[in-house]
Design a protein with these regions (language model features):
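N-terminal secretory/targeting leader peptides
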Residues: 10-109, 119, 127-329
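Bacterial N-terminal signal peptides
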Residues: 1-5
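Active-site-adjacent segment of FAD-dependent monooxygenases/related oxidoreductases
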Residues: 111, 115
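Alpha-helical scaffold segments in soluble metabolic enzymes
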Residues: 122
Length: 329
């Protein structure tokens, strides 16, 4: 899920007194979804706190560059900010693909604690050396589950089932490993593809299901696979970032971080009600044979994903064990 921000600024060195910048922000989320609303609040507060020096214009629904295209523009030094799943920067530093790999997290807090560790901070430095400044990794929009028209309990239930997925290699390989036939499509084409039978289902969070009315396509069964924790990072070119005065850089980072944390709190409080609202629309939920799916996806960490290694997986698991031990006290 992604954003692009075009930055217009003078090329010469400027002080915060005479610096102005206009940011065009695009993301694939529907205006009714929490992340879209959160981004809108960030834009408003940055404008207010910089007294108009940093102005952000938001464009929902992927009206400008998204996904891999947006991240590529950042890497090339274009005046964009990409808000996207960390696996897209995993194309440059594979550890970020491992960070959001399948079947890792039991809850939001585990991920939030992991990204604060020295392990992940070291990865942040590595990706900065590639020209990508990470402004935030904190955006979470819920666990991603399978949405189909029949119950899915085991990998065998997915044989021959075509599932829409984003174009990320991580998503494609994970859905295939789980037993489905991954079918990458832009989000804007998903509903027509479902209605025309091009795909049999998709994967996403309950918040996306309700906010975009996925259930109206007739796909009214949700399997609680929790195969991915839905996350987004915020990325900008290191060269572009260097042009912005420190005073404004601090505000930008603080506002993205603050609003992401607020969004997580809201999601935790809303999930149970969202499930009830979906059930009122006829959506049914079922548990899965999780060990059976984990057995299928664990091999992705051993050479199935470009650059991802078992060592990365083991490093993540070591940190998660520490985090879970602290939480259990």
């Amino acid at each position: 899920m992604s954003s692009a921000i075009f930055i217009s600024a003078c090329q010469k060195e400027q002080t915060s007194d005479d610096f102005t910048i206009t940011l065009r922000l695009s993301h694939v989320f529907n205006v009714n979804e929490e992340l879209a609303q959160s981004i809108e609040l960030v834009a408003q507060r940055i404008n207010e706190k910089t007294k108009g020096a940093v102005r952000i214009l938001t464009y929902p629904g992927g009206q400008i560059a998204t996904y891999k295209d947006g991240v590529e523009m950042v890497v090339r030094g274009a005046h964009f900010i990409s808000v996207e799943d960390p696996s897209y920067i995993g194309d440059y530093v594979p550890e970020f693909t491992a960070l959001v790999g399948p079947m890792l997290y039991n809850n939001f807090d585990e991920y939030m604690e992991l990204i604060k560790t020295p392990l992940v901070k070291g990865w942040l430095k590595k990706v900065e050396d590639k020209g990508i400044k990470v402004l935030s990794l904190q955006y979470i929009f819920g666990f991603r589950n399978l949405i189909t028209d029949k119950p899915v309990n085991t990998p065998d239930d997915l044989r021959g089932v075509k599932l829409r997925t984003p174009g990320s290699k991580l998503f494609i390989k994970t859905l295939n490993a789980m037993g489905a036939t991954a079918t990458p499509l832009p989000w804007g084409e998903t509903f027509s593809a479902l209605q025309q039978g091009v795909v049999d289902g998709l994967e996403g969070s309950e918040f996306t299901n309700l906010g975009t009315k996925v259930y109206e396509t007739g796909k009214k069964n949700v399997a609680f696979t929790k195969h991915f924790l839905g996350t987004c990072g915020v990325y900008i070119s290191t060269d572009v970032w260097a042009k912005i005065p420190q005073q404004y850089r601090t505000i930008i980072e603080q506002e993205f971080t603050y609003e992401a944390e607020q969004m997580i709190m809201q999601l935790k409080g809303k999930h149970a009600q969202v499930v009830k609202d979906l059930e009122a629309e006829g959506v049914k939920f079922n548990a899965i044979d999780r060990p059976a799916f984990e057995k299928r996806t664990i091999n992705l960490y051993d050479g199935e994903l470009p650059g991802v290694t078992v060592e990365m997986y083991d490093q993540i698991q070591t940190e998660l064990k520490k985090i879970r031990a602290r939480a259990a006290k």
